[in-house]
Swiss-Prot record:
Name the record gives this protein: Integration host factor subunit alpha
InterPro entries cross-referenced by the UniProt entry: Hist_DNA-bd (IPR000119), Histone-like_DNA-bd_CS (IPR020816), IHF-like_DNA-bd_dom_sf (IPR010992), IHF_alpha (IPR005684)
Family: Belongs to the bacterial histone-like protein family.
Top-level division of the source organism's lineage: Bacteria
Region Disordered, residue ranges: 49-73
Name of encoding gene: ihfA
Function: This protein is one of the two subunits of integration host factor, a specific DNA-binding protein that functions in genetic recombination as well as in transcriptional and translational control.
GO cellular component, one term: cytosol
Length: 99
């Protein structure tokens, strides 16, 4: 199961005593700041969590898997995420669900 923005808002409501509306606004504001920074070409560094980076990918040759036809894959900018060491360690040491 995936963690959703609604669940994050609910956790803030329960743990910090924020109103549901304020909790939802806080989550939305956080993600809007991350989006804005990336749109402006900035790296997003979240200490203890990881980094969101932008990478420019060049045009490259590709192939349509249905027809086998050669097609160019256009140049584009992509977002990458690199987890920080603390996050990696916590994930590696966590027990899988169901155990």
């Amino acid at each position: 199961m995936a963690l959703t923005k609604a669940e994050m808002s609910e956790h803030l409501f329960e743990k910090l005593g924020l109103s549901k509306r304020d909790a939802k606004d806080l989550v939305e504001l956080f993600f809007e700041e991350v989006r804005r920074a990336l749109e402006n070409g900035e790296q997003v560094k979240l200490s203890g969590f990881g980094n969101f980076d932008l990478r420019d990918k060049n045009q490259r040759p590709g192939r349509n898997p249905k027809t086998g036809e050669d097609i160019p894959i256009t140049a584009r900018r992509v977002v990458t995420f690199r987890p920080g060491q603390k996050l990696k360690s916590r994930v590696e040491n966590a027990s899988p669900k169901g155990e």
